[in-house]
Design a protein with these regions (language model features):
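Specific alpha-helical transmembrane segments that line the substrate/conduction pathway
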Residues: 46-57, 86-87, 95-134, 138, ...
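Helix-helix packing/entry segments at the starts of transmembrane helices
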Residues: 48-50, 106-112, 191-214, 244-284
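Transmembrane alpha-helical core positions of polytopic small-molecule transporters
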Residues: 25-29, 83-91, 113-114, 149, ...
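Hydrophobic transmembrane alpha-helices of multi-pass small-molecule transport proteins
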Residues: 59, 81, 112, 119-120, ...
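Membrane-interface interhelical linkers
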Residues: 1-23, 55-82, 127-136, 153-173, ...
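Residue-level signature of transmembrane alpha-helical cores of multipass secondary-active transporters
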Residues: 20-21, 25, 79-84, 95, ...
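Specific transmembrane alpha-helical segments of multi-pass solute transporters/efflux pumps
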Residues: 27, 31-34, 60-110, 120, ...
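Transmembrane alpha-helices of multi-pass small-molecule transport proteins
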Residues: 2, 16, 39-89, 112-120, ...
Length: 316
C-alpha cells in the first residue's frame, strides 16, 4: 500500500487565509490567559472537558440548522475516532506534563507540533511536499518561539539540575510529555488531512474530536477527583464561555474549514504565533513582564512564516 494519500489539491494561502489564521492564533493565545484566570476555581482538566462538551452541543446544533449530516455512514468513523483520541491525548499530555515541568518548557516542547506536522504531511500526503526554503522557515520560526521562552526554559532547567535526582527525572518526564503533546497535535492534523475526513464537512470533523475528547477528559477529571467548582464567579463563567464558544466552537470550526481549502503545512506554521500572542495578552491583561528578546523572537517567527509561505519560483 502506498504511504501517500491522493486528495483534492489545496491552494496556497491568500490574504484572507493569512488574516484569518492570525486572528485564530490571537484567539488561541488569549485562551491561555482565560485558562490561567479560571484554574483557581475550575480545575484545568474539568475545564477542558466542560469546554469540549459545550462546544460539541453547539456544533451539533449548528450542523442541524444547516442540514449537515453528522451521523451518516460515510466511512469516516475510524479516522474520526482516531482524531478524537489524539485530540484528547494532547490535552492529557499537557496537563500531566505541567505537573512535572514549567510552563515555559512545556510551551517550547508543545510547539514542536508544526515541525512534526510538516514532516507527517510531507511523508504521507500528496500536495504537501515542502521545499528547502520552507524547511528553513520552519526552523527559523521554531528558533524564534524557543528564544521567546528561553529565560523560563533555562531557569527551570537550572532549578531542576540543582534539585534532587528525582526532580530532574520528573522534569525530563514532563518535557517528554510536552514533546508527545506536540506529536499528538501534529498527528491529529495529519489524520484529518490524509484520511476520508479531508472529504467531509468541517462540522463533522470537529464533532468527532469534541465528543471523544469530552468523554476522555471528563472521565480523567473524575479519576483525578477534579469534578468540582470552588466558586462560581462572573470571570469563571466568562472564561468558560470564551473557551467553549469562541475557541472550541467558532475558531476550531474555522480551522477545519481552512484545512479543506488550503495547504495544511502552510497553515500550521502560523501556530507558532499562538504562544507569542499568549505572552502579549499576559503582558496587557495580567501585568506580566517581557524582555527586548521577545521582540527579536517575534521577528524570527514572522520571518519563518514568510519563508514557509513564499511562492515557488516559476520555471520558464
Amino acid at each position: 500500500m502506498s504511504t501517500t494519500t491522493a486528495l483534492p489539491a489545496r491552494r496556497a494561502l491568500d490574504s484572507f487565509a493569512i488574516l484569518l489564521m492570525i486572528g485564530l492564533c490571537a484567539i488561541w493565545g488569549l485562551q491561555q490567559v482565560a485558562i490561567k484566570t479560571t484554574n483557581a476555581t475550575v480545575p484545568p482538566v474539568f475545564q477542558a472537558g466542560l469546554r469540549s462538551t459545550i462546544a460539541a452541543v453547539l456544533v451539533w446544533a449548528w450542523a442541524r440548522s444547516r442540514g449537515t449530516p453528522l451521523f451518516r455512514d460515510d466511512g469516516t468513523l475510524g479516522a474520526g475516532l482516531l482524531a478524537g483520541v489524539l485530540f484528547a491525548a494532547e490535552f492529557v499530555c499537557i496537563f500531566l506534563g505541567l505537573t512535572l515541568t514549567s510552563a515555559s518548557r512545556m510551551a517550547v516542547f508543545l510547539y514542536t507540533a508544526p515541525c512534526f506536522t510538516a514532516l507527517g504531511l510531507h511523508w504521507f500526503v500528496d500536495g504537501e511536499r515542502m521545499r528547502r526554503i520552507q524547511w528553513l522557515g520552519i526552523g527559523v520560526a521554531f528558533l524564534g518561539m524557543a528564544l521567546a521562552f528561553a529565560d523560563g526554559f533555562l531557569h527551570a532547567g537550572a532549578a531542576a539540575g540543582a534539585g534532587a535526582h528525582g526532580s530532574t527525572l520528573a522534569g525530563a518526564a514532563g518535557d517528554a510529555l510536552g514533546v508527545l503533546a506536540g506529536i499528538t497535535w501534529a498527528a491529529t492534523t495529519v489524520v484529518v488531512r490524509g484520511s476520508r475526513l479531508a472529504h467531509t464537512s468541517a462540522s463533522k470533523t470537529l464533532f468527532y474530536q469534541l465528543t471523544v475528547s469530552a468523554v476522555v477528559l471528563l472521565a480523567l477529571a473524575v479519576g483525578l477527583g477534579q469534578v468540582r467548582v470552588e466558586t462560581v464567579t462572573p470571570l469563571a463563567l466568562a472564561s468558560l464561555a470564551y473557551q467553549a464558544v469562541i475557541v472550541a466552537f467558532v475558531s476550531y470550526l474555522l480551522w477545519f474549514w481552512l484545512l479543506t481549502r488550503y495547504i495544511a503545512s502552510r497553515l500550521s506554521v502560523f501556530s507558532f504565533l499562538t504562544p507569542m500572542f499568549g505572552v502579549t495578552f499576559g503582558v496587557l491583561l495580567l501585568g506580566e513582564s517581557f524582555s527586548a528578546r521577545f521582540l527579536i523572537a517575534a521577528l524570527l517567527v514572522l520571518t519563518g512564516i514568510a519563508l514557509v509561505n513564499a511562492p515557488a519560483k516559476r520555471t520558464a
